[in-house]
Amino acid sequence: MLFNSVDFLIFFPIVTLIYFLIPHKIRYIWLLVCSYYFYMCWNAQYALLLFASTFITWLSGIAIDNAAKKEEGTDRTRSKGIVAISLVLNLTLLFFFKYANFTIENLNALLADTGVTIRVPKLDLLLPVGISFYIFQALSYTIDVYRGDVQVERNLLRYMVFVSFFPQLVAGPIERSSRLLGQFYEKHRFSFDRMVQGLMLMLWGYFQKMVVADRLSVLVDQVFNYSSYYQGFTILIGALFFAVQVYCDFAGYSTIAVGAAQIMGFDLMENFHQPYFATSVADFWRRWHISLSTWFRDYLYIPLGGNRNGKWAKYRNIMIVFLTSGLWHGANWTYVIWGGLNGLYQVIGAQTKKLRAGCRRLFGVRENTGSGRLLATVITFLLVAFSWIFFRAATLEDALTVIRQLFSSFNPWVLFDGTLYTLGLSMVDFWIGVLAILTIFAVDLLHEKNVRIRQWVLEQNWMFRWVLYFVALFVILIFGFYGPNYDAAQFIYFQF
């Protein structure tokens, strides 16, 4: 069941209505039933995997809490052992379903290179939707209980709804128990203002997904799937469009999730904060997929030592985090290269800080001026967009083909001679896409300037507000892309 499906538009109002009608004491049970139904709409069997990860981490939390009461002083051997078992079991589940065939493919390639004729057969597995998201959310609970950051949850059903809460189950945000778990104890009363604010968020998310991301995907697919036929600026447009597509696709999902949860009285974390207005790659990763970035910061980067042991240890830790992040995104070397490239950008950025400051002085560019920030933002966007080539390409060979074709010709005339209208989008759809992109960046710019758009809308008279809401709805219905290549299942981050 996808957010941009008719099924969800029927499912969500029914769930919300019943949620507010039934007694507070059983609301979390209702949410649990609905969340598991939501997940089982993809594949009912994989609900067992969701439950397995949930039960392991719930039981681990209780065992850690019990062990902590018996441990003396700083000796936490038993608790550490329980955490280790929880990590191993959950990561084994993740490895088996997500990385087993990737490992087999690479093993077979290695055997072939060494002349061995034996081949390991691949497993007949489908990747469970959202497995990386809910396993990371569940693991954070185990670790937080061990650290003493949260109290143990002994109610299994309430913990199950924390892990499986349907708005953020399959593509985040990856919530922490310290933020979300306690909200299932709160007595949420229906709030008309919260409903309106949540609906505004959902409309904006649907605009990002259906008007922008789905439209751009047609041109992007054409360019990347047949990259050997295109050159220069045609490839450049495809790469830049993908940078916007992946942002609007994922941010759109997160925005819908936050809005849906808000309607029911729950507050989920912000997952994107104007990432394409970042002035460095490090700044970009403080703004992009914030729930995952902070997860890796708190549970991998800092435990590795963070920046405490000198710059080279810091650089090593950055590379470990981003290589791991790349692998988290997918079982493909393209994702590993993408992650490594983003880590390398940051290492090079830190190492060349003085050199770049000297260059700015030489050319009279001040870092904190508007022109200085604009230059840094454009450079950061281009670096990130280049790395997205590896993220989008099906194989390393395809990625290298795209890069080779990108620099193979200087042909700016394709921007004006109609070539861009032969890439799957008509001239009208192409320019609707461009206007939609400008709208996305204009809204992000206002947010960057601390303009609270939703608050401003709520301060207007009721007639203006509701006209605006219906205009937004009709824009999505009229300009949402429903062409021959449209597939409601194509939320990019569902594959992770």
Predicted ranges, named:
Residues M1-Q495:
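Membrane-embedded transmembrane alpha-helical bundles that form the catalytic cores
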